[in-house]
Amino acid sequence: MDAYDYMEQAADVGEKTLEGVRLIEQAIKAADAENDVEAGYEARDMLMDATYDLGMPKKQLMAFAWMIKQFEAEEIYIDEDDLMWKYKWVALGIVDFPEITKAQIDHLLDDMKQKYLGFQYSLKPYYKIRTMMAMSMGEPEEVTRLRAEWQAAKKDYMNDCIACETNDEVYFQFYHGDYQKAVDKAKSLISGRQKCDEVPHLTNGVLALAFWQLGNAEAAAERFKKGYKLTQGKAEFLNANADFIQYLTASEQWQEAEKVAQAELKVLP
């Protein structure tokens, strides 16, 4: 079978399943064996979409590194808008790999910045990712500086949707311990006026924690009850479910916390 046969089989069984991923990886091997760059790119693009939903960032990173090399080689046609959009996925996920140094992370983000400038894209996504990374790395002064750049940068079609932007703002306020402001920022998400495929799924866990910190146990419980239904057993929402576990332990719901933790451990790829 050639690469396209494997990709067709993956589509038949469902690309965003473990079996689908296995077949896509077979497609990549077949394409590389035949030195078929176009098929190899198409298969890796398919793999990136599948692993994004399945929570497999390492596979995603390896596929993207190859795709970027082909993009820079300029041997085949590549949709730069699509590839640069996927750059955001990789950049946000790379901080979770302990084996990747800060210098390597900085190099990747500098490359992203230069490519965005080259295509005359807004740097708003770049500065937002930098802000989120500084939050993850415990660099409060950098967080403040980078957020100012994020807020000041112009918007364009490479920006995330309004619901995702609001979600990130909620996380920013929670990071700074301003729980009331986090809740206030989230009103449009709680009401459903702003939503997308990932939000408020990503937001409910941190909101449960924020409400608990504010002493509103009823609202916190409601966020868990409604929110976990959206994210239960889904690998792409493991971080949100980790927030729910934190909420359950903070509120001393030990049995429920253990139940959720055990269920989500089974989801890990």
At which residue positions do the language-model features occur?
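Generic helix N-cap/helix-start motif at coil->alpha-helix transitions
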Residues: 1-7, 40-42, 84-87, 119-128, ...
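Alpha-helical adaptor scaffolds
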Residues: 206-215, 232, 241-246, 252
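Long, ordered, amphipathic alpha-helical scaffolds
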Residues: 242-269
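Flexible inter-repeat linkers and adjacent short helices
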Residues: 1-104, 254, 261, 269
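Residue-level signature for tetratricopeptide repeat
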Residues: 9, 13, 30, 50, ...
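Extended alpha-helical scaffold segments
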Residues: 124-130, 134-147, 154, 163, ...
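Helix-turn-helix repeat elements of alpha-solenoid scaffolds
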Residues: 13-26, 55-69, 97-111, 134-149, ...
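Solenoid-like repeat scaffolds
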Residues: 29-36, 68-77, 111-121, 148-160, ...
